[in-house]
Amino acid sequence: MSSAVLADHVERQLDELGWETSHIVGNSLGGWVAFELERRGRARSVTGIAPAGGWTRWSPVKFEVIAKFIAGAPILAVAHILGQRALRLPFSRLLATLPISATPDGVSERELSGIIDDAAHCPAYFQLLVKALVLPGLQELEHTAVPSHVVLCEQDRVVPPSRFSRHFTDSLPAGHRLTVLDGVGHVPMFEAPGRITELITSFIEECCPHVRAS
């Protein structure tokens, strides 16, 4: 399992729909896949929200991210063993939301239950870590040929903007958009769904004025 394999899967889905290109949006690993799909010529525009992959093969920041996910392995094991009962443990909400939201209250009970269920049934977790360890991150960003929007999250503990934005800002062509969202963590759709929706739709409307007109 790798970002390339995930991009292959999305390409097959696009082919099944009969879509040569589309406006592609992704968060975290999904942001990495979004830029990979752009490199393959499948994007009309690309929006990466707290995107992963912002490193070279030997960047210290890459190993920092991998170390964070390895450190989270015990929590993953508890979720796998206990399932929803893991949420009854002391500090479970705090620990479960650290990589996701700025505050523990940023995720609802229903959403947190879904997160625990996903974590308990994710066989690709360690496969992705191994692939990330041996492979470079996003390459050829300087050749990005469509409008691109990088959205960073101020309270992101997984890829903090202060250390993880440089690969994008240095590599993407002039004219790309960079937005920093205040007060949200790595998965801002939980804490600020309205703001994220507005960011996505307004960017697409700018790229394609006829969308707004219709």
UniProtKB/Swiss-Prot annotation:
Write down what this protein is called.
Answer: Epoxide hydrolase EphH
Name the species this protein comes from. Mycobacterium tuberculosis (strain ATCC 25618 / H37Rv)
Recorded GO MF terms: hydrolase activity
Whether Hydrolase counts among this entry's keywords is yes
Q: What does this protein do?
A: Catalyzes the hydrolysis of epoxide-containing substrates. In vitro, catalyzes the hydrolysis of the synthetic compounds PHOME and styrene oxide. Plays an essential role in subverting phagosomal acidification. Plays a major role in the survival of M.tuberculosis (Mtb) during in vitro acidic stress and protects Mtb in response to phagosomal acidification inside macrophages. Also supports Mtb growth under the nutrient-deprived condition at pH 7.0.
Upregulation: Expression is up-regulated during acid stress.
Leader sequence range is: none
Query: What phenotype is described for loss of this gene?
Result: Knockdown mutant shows increased reactive oxygen species (ROS) generation in acidic stress and nutrient depleted conditions.
State whether keyword Hydrolase applies.
Answer: yes
Q: Where is the active site?
A: S28, D156, H186
Q: Which gene encodes it?
A: ephH
What is the E.C. number? 3.3.2.10
Q: Which UniProt keywords apply?
A: Hydrolase
The uppermost taxa in this organism's lineage are: Bacteria, Bacillati, Actinomycetota, Actinomycetes, Mycobacteriales
Annotated Pfam families: Abhydrolase_6 (PF12697)
